[in-house]
């Protein structure tokens, strides 16, 4: 079960950093068909 906790923490941290950068610097070019 430790692996599940570590994975959850890792995804959560990456998600927070991603959203922080995304909202801090809006993309200057429109992203289409890119996930």
Curated annotation (Swiss-Prot):
GO terms for biological process: photosynthesis. This is Photosystem II reaction center protein T. Pfam families: PsbT. The chain crosses the membrane at residues 3-23. It is found in: Plastid, Chloroplast thylakoid membrane. GO terms for cellular component: chloroplast thylakoid membrane; photosystem II reaction center. It comes from the Eukaryota. The keyword rRNA-binding does not apply. The gene is psbT. InterPro entries: PSII_PsbT (IPR001743), PSII_PsbT_sf (IPR037268). Found at the monomer-monomer interface of the photosystem II (PS II) dimer, plays a role in assembly and dimerization of PSII. PSII is a light-driven water plastoquinone oxidoreductase, using light energy to abstract electrons from H(2)O, generating a proton gradient subsequently used for ATP formation. Keywords: Chloroplast, Membrane, Photosynthesis, Photosystem II, Plastid, Thylakoid, Transmembrane, Transmembrane helix. Belongs to the PsbT family. PSII is composed of 1 copy each of membrane proteins PsbA, PsbB, PsbC, PsbD, PsbE, PsbF, PsbH, PsbI, PsbJ, PsbK, PsbL, PsbM, PsbT, PsbY, PsbZ, Psb30/Ycf12, at least 3 peripheral proteins of the oxygen-evolving complex and a large number of cofactors. It forms dimeric complexes. It is a single-pass membrane protein.
């Amino acid at each position: 079960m430790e692996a599940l906790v570590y994975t959850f923490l890792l995804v959560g941290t990456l998600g927070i950093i991603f959203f922080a950068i995304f909202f801090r610097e809006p993309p200057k070019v429109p992203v289409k068909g890119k996930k």
